[in-house]
C-alpha cells in the first residue's frame, strides 16, 4: 500500500504536461476532458467530495477508496489532492448510525488537517481506454482486443 500513490502518478503526469500552474480544478478539467462518454450535464458520480478545488496542487494521490489509512498516508507524504474511484463517505450499511457519523467526522477531520481535496473519478475511470477498469480486466484475463465494440 505504501507505493500505491507513487505507482499511478506517472499516468496523471502524462495527462498534465503543459500545465504550468496547476490548480486542483485544472487537473479535474483535464480528467473530464478524457471522459468524452460521460454526460457531464446529467447524472455522473464524478465530483469533488471534500475540500477546495481552487488550491494549487502540491502532490496527487490516486486510490480505489480514500480510507482513513490512505488519508493518513497522504498526510505523511504531503499530498493535498486525492483522486478516489469510490465514494469516501458511504452512508448505508448495517453500522450503528452514531458510529457511522463518528467515522465520517473523523475522516473529515483528517482531510481538513491536511487541507486535502478529494475528487471522485468513477465514470471516467471505469472506461478510460488502456487504464480503465474494463481494459485492465480484459488484459488481466488475457483477452486480445484492439477495438472496442462499444464505448461504455
Q: Across the structure, where does each feature detected by a protein language model lie?
A:
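Targeting/processing segments of secretory and organellar proteins
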Residues: 2-4
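Hydrophobic structural segments
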Residues: 10-152
